[in-house]
């Protein structure tokens, strides 16, 4: 497949997604690295702020009802519920992929899926990495616009914050689809984004919080980690806070705002601070992304917290280190994993429909909670959630490829 990266080594997205490279290392080494976390930073910066959760209400559920919902979310090999028909592959397209930050395993997982699907289509792909900064995003868009794409995928950045750049694409008649660029799946109102591909973030957050309630038998002491720069993150943290507040025996200790791009610098110190402040009252950490735990785990280990002494659950996206921690039973007990590779294929399918003058499919994948009981299935042996539902064959059949 023609593939022209604009960042060094971007043509090897597997390495970016999983620096632990499981196909080249032993499981013993992987588990040691998972305990230690990844990308350990010598510099520790204080100062992420606490934020009050917004008022979102949820009706309290019985423990039996809670457990039933959690069990349903952990089912494996769920049948395909996406599109079965659509236009054949439109020829000769070039796609620009603007990534918020390729240190985010979710974004790189989507990029891998897009790359697979583009290769199947016979199209061309270039990836522009914003590296997690506003200046980087501006530069990435400038380069993407200058490359004159036929279509653009916005991955992990808030669409409303980039609306001026997206409007330039719309004025050229360039279709835009996105991943995690808004608070819900579907078109993003007020922007040219025709389809925001994501599982339902409200349901993702609900399942994550209910997982903590079920684990603790209704007595969880919870800290929530979020990034208020992103609407989807705020939606998730507000819903999780609401679920915990609705649990009579649970305690919402704190909602902490930490920029994902700063997690490497700030999470070690924040983890130490939270341990000192709440002690054994802190039983569960809920985060809007697994990456926070990459940097919290070394601090927990250093503090002598037993691996079962604090339960970490993430409302996205199912990173390789998260799978390793769950398999090894090292702090993290769950992640509501996005089917990242499948969503990459869906993004390409949605663009193909737009190129053909057809409406988007609007498909929303069901929510899936990965835990110790199902982590080995549906792609778990490759440290990802890759549903065993035949999506690749189905899309190839639709595209006549």
Where are each of the predicted segments found?
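Hinge/cleft segment of the Venus flytrap/periplasmic-binding protein
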Residues: 49-93, 244, 339, 343-401
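Extracytoplasmic "Venus flytrap"
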Residues: 51-113, 126-138, 143, 156-159, ...
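Structural motif
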Residues: 79-81, 125-148, 255-278, 293-296
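An alpha-beta-alpha
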Residues: 95-99, 103-104, 114, 206-257, ...
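Short beta-strand elements in bilobed, periplasmic/extracellular small-molecule ligand-binding domains
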Residues: 119-131, 221-223, 244-264, 309
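Hydrophobic alpha-helical segments within soluble ligand-binding/sensing domains
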Residues: 137, 195-222, 234-235, 267-268, ...
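Hydrophobic alpha-helical
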Residues: 156-171, 240, 259-325
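Flexible loop/hinge segments that line or gate small-molecule binding clefts
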Residues: 160, 164-203, 221, 320-325, ...
